[in-house]
């Protein structure tokens, strides 16, 4: 089947909304391959950041965490690999690959890697 859709990549500003142009524009890629685990660390990579929000990949080593905090906007967390615990307003949720949770704006939340854990965080303003 012939693809009649034509997309001119040269018409796209390759750095618009993409930090450091490290992520392909109009090309497929694997989210889990774009962020690697580091011993004793939380690694994050911003995929998109602009005035309307941001999309960030995270890789947590086992036992690592993001301490309790609030955010001014709703966010959705999607688990890409491993198992993590998300605590929202004191309530604990264990999430595994393929599961997601919405964290409401201005509500205290934290993330803990119960084992090595990769997630995609999308925050929309």
What is the role of each PLM region?
Residues 80-81, 96-97, 115:
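A cytosolic small-molecule/anion-sensing beta-strand core signal
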Residues 90-105:
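Short acidic-glycine-tyrosine-enriched beta hairpin
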């Amino acid at each position: 089947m012939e693809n009649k859709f034509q997309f001119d990549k040269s018409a796209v500003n390759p750095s618009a909304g993409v930090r450091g142009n490290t992520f392909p524009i109009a090309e497929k890629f694997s989210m889990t391959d774009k962020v690697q685990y580091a011993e004793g660390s939380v690694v994050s990579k911003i995929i998109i950041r602009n005035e309307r929000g941001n999309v960030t990949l995270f890789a947590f080593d086992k036992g690592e965490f993001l301490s309790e905090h609030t955010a001014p906007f709703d966010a959705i967390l999607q688990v890409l690999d491993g198992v993590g615990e998300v605590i929202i307003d004191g309530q604990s949720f264990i999430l595994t690959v393929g599961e997601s949770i919405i964290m409401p704006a201005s509500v205290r939340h934290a993330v803990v890697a119960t084992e090595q854990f990769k997630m995609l965080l999308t925050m929309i303003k």
